[in-house]
Amino acid sequence: MIDTKALINQFDEIKSRLAIKKVSEETLSALKDMALKYKSCKQELEELQAFQNKTSKLFGEYKREQKDITALKVALDENKVKMSTLESTLKEIESHLETLAYGIPNLPDDATPEGEDENDNVEIKKVLSPPHFDFVPKEHWELGIANGWIDFEAGVKLAKSRFSVLRGMGAKLNRALINFMLDYNEKAGFESIVTPVIVNARALFGTGQLPKFEEDMFKVDSHFCDEQSEHDLYLISTSEITLTNLYQDSIIPSEELPIMLTAQTPCFRKEAGSAGRDTRGMIRQHQFDKVELVAITHPTQSAAMQEKMVQTASEILSELKLPHRLMQLCGGDLGFSASNTIDIEVWLPGQNCYREISSISNTRDFQARRAKIRYKENGKNALVHTLNGSSLAVGRTLIAIMENYQQVDGSVMIPEVLQKYL
């Protein structure tokens, strides 16, 4: 959630920076007007509270001195009614303000290049050269079926399209990748966590999936919830949600920062906006495994932490000897919660192109403001910065291994670094 105080004081600058994310001036003006209304109402309420306190003190003095308290009593009663009415109004305004603010994306930071879409992203560097084949390389779905690693028909039979079943060596490699990634992340200083894969709406508001992206979330049937539950429940689309929200409504001593976490979970997405895209294979699934990195930092640490997270994910691909490149996303291609994002794209010979395998984002204080995550330093509280990124998407890493390690006879070699995990 953006800082509404900053919006009031720096409206033109924020309007300009959010224009690249297609936020209209009318939308921001409506938010600014509501923020000013909230500020005015709150100030008026504080004045009434100050009057109430001052008059109550005077009322006590008059009573002790046996002076006439009739006028003071009337003033206090009338002021109390005004306060009650204004408190209700303030709550209503606050609710409207939050509704508007929750729909506004994060500001691109100064290091994010200008641009409209993925075509304007900037390549930072390539790591490892793509392999040369003396034959036409196959796509992963052909290799997966031929080697008995992937059963797409079984996924459809058990669920629907965009689900698949891994078998034999496919399942073993999937497990090996998860263990390898978690081990590597731990060595880089990230603490392993196991979290639920079902969360309440409060958690999704905290990290920015709700309210804007509810159509892409799998919602748990209300019959699952007990009658006393006040929460809608959802399957997570990423463990960024659970890892970040472990610290919602927290005040963290500054000396405990940074907090660095990693987790592996299944992730669930409806892919509502992806009709017709990547319909074959495992590139875009409703359920997939992902190993995630999340960091909670002091504001001065977040840029360096993003570099560390990118380095960690890139090193995993290098250990697997998978060619990849780092891409700096332009403002128009940034996600809703991101202020700065570096994508890692892995080379897929069967598709003859690079495909995203990780997005590592610095959200600065955007999620922290929504989830109310603060740190205490020198007796004062301030918002932390939060970062998240895949390290890595397991299914896409498996795809990359199949395509980069394929042999002329259709078999697939196993990366040396994974062999001890099998």
Curated annotation (Swiss-Prot):
GO terms for biological process: selenocysteine biosynthetic process; seryl-tRNA aminoacylation. Pfam families: Seryl_tRNA_N (PF02403), tRNA-synt_2b (PF00587). One of its GO terms (molecular function) is serine-tRNA ligase activity. L-serine binds at T238, S239, E240, E292, S390. Gene3D superfamilies: Bira Bifunctional Protein, Domain 2 (3.30.930.10), Serine-tRNA synthetase, tRNA binding domain (1.10.287.40). Its EC number is 6.1.1.11. Signal peptide: none annotated. It is found in: Cytoplasm. GO terms for cellular component: cytoplasm. Transmembrane segments: none annotated. ATP binds at R269, K270, E271, E356, I357, S358, S359. It catalyses: tRNA(Ser) + L-serine + ATP = L-seryl-tRNA(Ser) + AMP + diphosphate + H(+); tRNA(Sec) + L-serine + ATP = L-seryl-tRNA(Sec) + AMP + diphosphate + H(+). Pathway: Aminoacyl-tRNA biosynthesis; selenocysteinyl-tRNA(Sec) biosynthesis; L-seryl-tRNA(Sec) from L-serine and tRNA(Sec): step 1/1. Keywords: Aminoacyl-tRNA synthetase, ATP-binding, Cytoplasm, Ligase, Nucleotide-binding, Protein biosynthesis. Catalyzes the attachment of serine to tRNA(Ser). Is also able to aminoacylate tRNA(Sec) with serine, to form the misacylated tRNA L-seryl-tRNA(Sec), which will be further converted into selenocysteinyl-tRNA(Sec). Homodimer. The tRNA molecule binds across the dimer. Belongs to the class-II aminoacyl-tRNA synthetase family. Type-1 seryl-tRNA synthetase subfamily. Consists of two distinct domains, a catalytic core and a N-terminal extension that is involved in tRNA binding. This is Serine--tRNA ligase. It comes from Helicobacter hepaticus (strain ATCC 51449 / 3B1).
